Amino acid sequence: MKLNEHIFRANDIRGIAYEDLNEQVVSLLGRSLGSEALSRDIKDLIIARDARVSSPEIMEWLSSGILSTGCNVIDIGIVTSPMFYHSTFELAASSGVVITGSHNPAEYNGFKIVFKNQSTSSDEILLLRERIINKDFQLGQGKLDKADIKESYINRIVKSVQLNKALDISIDCGNGAAGVVAKEVYEKLGCNVIELYGNPDGLFPNHHPDPSKKENMLDLIDSVAVSYTHLTLPTKA
């Protein structure tokens, strides 16, 4: 097996889907994650994903690897990164991984990992790599469950935020994972929402969901010019 060691970054793991992150590599990463979790007395890992085309398969490969160690998996489906972090406090499990390419090009994907409500450090990322290289895996048969944390996430925000007046806002979800929740959150806060590209689509047919690039903001700028909203909100994948 060829393992591109450059996928192991300072605080996450990322590379090109189906090349750097192929079935064998991702399954081994799952075995490494499950084994490391069990060594810390963590018996359950939450797994989430973004809307990228490669994410469902990568989720299957990763889950398979984790389950093969005896560690359990809780699948929470397509969520934003903040929703994933919320789940580690809301659910019984305080650890997990979200499969996301963030703002990187569509062919990329990656993993953000949390153990006991703490994001992994660079040293912990290297520990996962060493487990793969040394084949230091536990064996067992974990259990797969599913959970929906959308309602609890929305309720948490609504209880924490109070607006002085109803706002007219424009949101560009860029066909990313934000589309599963953004409009509903702001409507429950009392806002009038104009939503662009709220349907999650990993091909990103309208523009790439990276608001740091001016060209990805043009549709939102046009929307504001027409609607005169109080606030504009671009989102990442």
Predicted regions and their residues:
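Gly/Ser/Thr-enriched, mixed-charge loops and adjacent short helices
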Residues: 109-227
